[in-house]
Amino acid sequence: REMGMGSTDYGQAWSDLKVNHESIIDRRTTVIVLGDGRSNYGDPRADLFREFAQRAKSMIWLNPEGRALRGTGDSAIPRYLPFCTQMSHVATLKDLERAVDEVLAAYG
């Protein structure tokens, strides 16, 4: 398989998820997204993300960018955020540990 240094295309990722795996997303599913939410000015397909959020138990987004950068430039995070159960800044292992603790606490 050929790999390249292409741009992030969240819209295509959500389209692929819908076509290939939508049937397995249900009220028992936790969807975890790892990424900065930058669309490179493509269509972020927040409509599909919303559909997954309506089907899933929870939508967790682990974002390496801090809050100050969300919504700047090509960031589509403001379009996804209303459908996220949790949005966490994760740039270090310590951040990841905190985010996992938050997720586990939410499942109580």
Spell out what each predicted region is.
Residues 28-41, 85:
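DG-centered beta-turn motif at the end of beta-strands
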Residues 44-50:
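Charged helix-capping and loop-helix junction motifs
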Residues 50-108:
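Von Willebrand factor type A / integrin I
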Residues 6-13, 48, 76, 96:
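Alpha-helical structural motif
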Residues 3-8, 36, 86-91:
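Short, exposed beta-strand "edge-strand" segments with a Pro/Gly-rich flavor and a Y/T-containing core
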Residues 1-29, 65-66, 71-72:
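Von Willebrand factor
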Residues 33-34, 45, 58-62:
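Short, local alpha-helical segments
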Residues 41-44, 98:
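Extracytoplasmic/secreted cell-surface and envelope-processing proteins
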